[in-house]
């Protein structure tokens, strides 16, 4: 009798769908065997980047490309005046592969090149699919592949780095908008100017957006053209490697925001009609074009596509020493309708035949491969449908991600701020939303990410304070709206952080309430960089209130990080009284008490808590966080015995709770 998969054992409600779950699991097992071949492994299979593309050999150069629909292929570039010449014609071999070998002296480091691909009825210039370096001409704006063979390639100093994940505290960032200046930041500037800030703040991982080359800067890196090339607008491959190496030396893991859910439509720069056909890498029917993203959808049922994408995962892990990936657009991959306009209200919605089983197989194999290449690697899914098993082990019947993004939380905060008066904020609803997750899957909590900061949306601080940010952020300027916004910003972030069961993520600048929105240069804004940067000077200034939020974030991150395995300790609710708007919960020896009431401060407020002594750790009302110092931090609180609760080891913890404040206490028996 076949053994029941663990995800079904752990959730009896999945039993009616066991055939579908087992079928998906079996599909992945079968496909892995097929790809690995007799005596091989998935790790062996994922070596396309070592065969295709341009490689230096002992005798010269070798170049290969998969282009089954092509009738002729030429290598063109600065070395042959960009013309088709017989000596640079590729030869077709088995499997639709084209190859050429060249003498050593034909190509040099820095040379630019492309392919000229011919097919029945047409031809076009193409950037090689496996190009590891593409650059854009500043005058013509044309992209080309570039030979990258420096005389002294970068050598990593930190070997065998192991990420700290107990808990995982992620700083989401974008290299280009990482500087104060109105322009594009570089890998080197980020390494020198931003990494030290992240280290000081206490985050133990960074998640870098927009690494894979993309023609349009304003796409935020999500319309990828060259999947193996680190974006050259930020610097060289060696400078990115140095950044990652430096992060590792500081104990900071580096996660890459990887895009395997779709590709840019561009044909000259990207994979669209690479060999003249419509279905080489992508679906050839109505599924080819994404209905919402103006991009192309991969055909995950093709082994050549799996070869390309799986090898891509391995390439970034080995070549650049990334510590894992946050997979973008997973919902779009999982469903034929990309999850668009669909409400996921029951388990039926996950097993009704509307799922792309080929994509599920790919994601399962990708997770298995990544963890084989690096057992300490981190994988995170950006997925909003709530697909069960997404962050369960493959061996348990899951898809194999380590974490899933808790995407309902930022939506909850936006809805609460927009639609509810302060006096209607309910602690019961807040606690339920923050802890409503599958017991056997780890999540990444967050109050907001880059999505909420984009033009057309608003960050939490901007929703709370709005235009008063422009006029009333001086330390000596007392404005009720600003005070309210700062108080709630602190509470929202701490309650979201304190309830994690896996990790937490913050987008750069949001920790100190960076004003306004993100808007990359485009025709509609006059190609301005004004809103595509981070104004670090705001948090550095002693006369501005941003410093209060920055200091609070630093201290709560260090607090959670100081508690090993904080994310694994049970979240024990002690008190949630909607009438008073008070919430209290315990994790290990820390007790978090929130008073969301906008107008009432409570003296000697009683909370039922384990009997013992409670000492102050921090509170949001301290003046270093922009508060009023209404709480005496020197007082130790002994619980008051109550005959009704004493048999259970519980007593009354009496506290002073200022309005719109949170305090953290340490419990001692």
How would you describe each model-predicted region?
Residues 65, 115, 173, 198, ...:
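Conserved, mostly hydrophobic/aromatic
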Residues 178, 350-355, 476-485, 537-547, ...:
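Active-site rim elements
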Residues 135, 143, 321-323, 341-532, ...:
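Conserved alpha/beta catalytic core and glycan-binding cleft of carbohydrate-active enzymes
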Residues 1-62, 83-84, 89-172, 177-182, ...:
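The feature marks proteins involved in alpha-glucan
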Residues 66-73, 609-612:
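Short proline/glycine-enriched turn/loop motifs at strand-loop junctions of beta-rich domains
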């Amino acid at each position: 009798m076949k053994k029941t998969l663990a995800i079904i054992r752990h959730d009896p409600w999945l039993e009616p769908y066991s055939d579908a779950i087992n079928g998906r699991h079996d599909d992945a097992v079968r496909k892995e065997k097929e790809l690995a071949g007799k005596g091989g492994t998935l790790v062996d299979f994922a070596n396309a980047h070592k065969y295709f593309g341009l490689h230096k050999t002992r005798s010269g150069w070798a170049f290969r490309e998969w282009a089954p629909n092509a009738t002729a292929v030429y290598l063109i570039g600065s070395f042959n005046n960009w013309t088709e010449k017989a000596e640079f014609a590729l030869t077709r071999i088995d499997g639709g592969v084209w190859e050429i070998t060249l003498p050593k002296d034909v190509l040099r480091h820095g040379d630019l090149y492309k392919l000229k691909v011919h097919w029945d009825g047409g031809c076009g210039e193409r950037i090689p699919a496996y190009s590891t370096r593409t650059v854009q001409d500043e005058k013509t704006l044309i992209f080309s592949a570039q030979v990258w063979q420096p005389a002294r390639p970068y050598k990593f100093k930190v070997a065998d780095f192991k990420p700290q994940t107990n808990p995982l505290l992620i700083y989401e960032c974008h290299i280009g908008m990482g500087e104060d200046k109105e322009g594009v930041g570089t890998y080197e500037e980020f390494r020198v100017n931003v990494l030290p800030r992240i280290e000081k703040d206490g985050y133990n991982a960074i998640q870098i957006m927009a690494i894979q080359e993309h023609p349009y800067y304003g796409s935020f890196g999500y319309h990828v053209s060259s999947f193996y090339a680190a974006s050259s607008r930020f610097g060289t491959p060696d400078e990115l490697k140095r950044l990652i190496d430096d992060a590792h030396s500081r104990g900071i893991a580096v996660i890459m925001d990887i895009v395997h859910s779709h590709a840019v439509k561009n044909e000259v720069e990207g994979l669209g009609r690479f060999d003249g056909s419509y279905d080489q890498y992508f679906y050839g029917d109505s599924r080819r074009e994404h209905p919402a993203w103006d991009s192309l959808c991969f055909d995950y049922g093709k082994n050549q596509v799996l070869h390309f994408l799986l090898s891509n995962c391995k390439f970034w892990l080995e070549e650049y020493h990334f510590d894992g990936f946050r997979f973008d657009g997973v919902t779009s991959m999982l469903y034929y309708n990309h999850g668009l306009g669909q409400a996921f209200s029951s388990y039926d919605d996950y097993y009704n035949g509307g799922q792309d089983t080929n994509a599920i197989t790919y994601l399962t194999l990708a997770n298995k491969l990544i963890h084989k290449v690096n057992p300490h690697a981190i994988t995170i899914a950006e997925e909003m449908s709530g697909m069960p098993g997404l962050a369960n082990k493959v061996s348990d019947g899951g898809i194999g991600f380590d974490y899933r993004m808790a995407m309902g939380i930022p939506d909850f905060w936006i809805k609460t701020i927009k639609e509810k008066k302060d006096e209607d904020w309910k602690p019961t609803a807040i606690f339920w939303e923050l802890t409503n997750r599958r017991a056997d899957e780890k999540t990444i909590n967050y109050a907001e990410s880059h999505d909420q900061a984009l033009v057309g949306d608003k960050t939490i601080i901007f929703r709370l304070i709005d235009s008063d940010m422009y006029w009333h952020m001086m330390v000596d300027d007392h404005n009720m709206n600003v005070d309210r916004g700062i108080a709630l910003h602190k509470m929202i972030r701490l309650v979201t952080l304190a309830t994690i069961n896996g990790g937490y993520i913050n987008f750069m600048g949001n920790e100190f309430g960076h004003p306004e929105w993100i808007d990359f240069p485009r025709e509609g804004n006059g190609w301005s960089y004004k809103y595509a940067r981070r104004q670090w000077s705001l948090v550095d200034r002693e006369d501005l209130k941003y410093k209060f939020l920055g200091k609070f974030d630093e201290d709560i991150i260090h607090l959670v990080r100081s508690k090993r395995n904080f994310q694994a300790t049970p979240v024990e609710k002690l008190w949630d009284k909607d009438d008073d708007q008070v919430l209290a919960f315990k994790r290990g020896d820390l007790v978090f008490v929130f008073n969301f009431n906008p107008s009432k401060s409570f003296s000697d407020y009683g909370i039922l808590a384990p009997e013992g002594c409670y000492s102050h750790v921090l509170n949001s009302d301290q003046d270093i966080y922009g508060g009023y110092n209404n709480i005496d931090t020197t007082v130790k609180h002994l619980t008051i015995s109550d005959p009704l609760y004493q048999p259970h080891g519980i007593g009354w913890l009496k506290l002073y709770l200022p309005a719109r404040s949170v305090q953290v206490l340490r419990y001692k028996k």
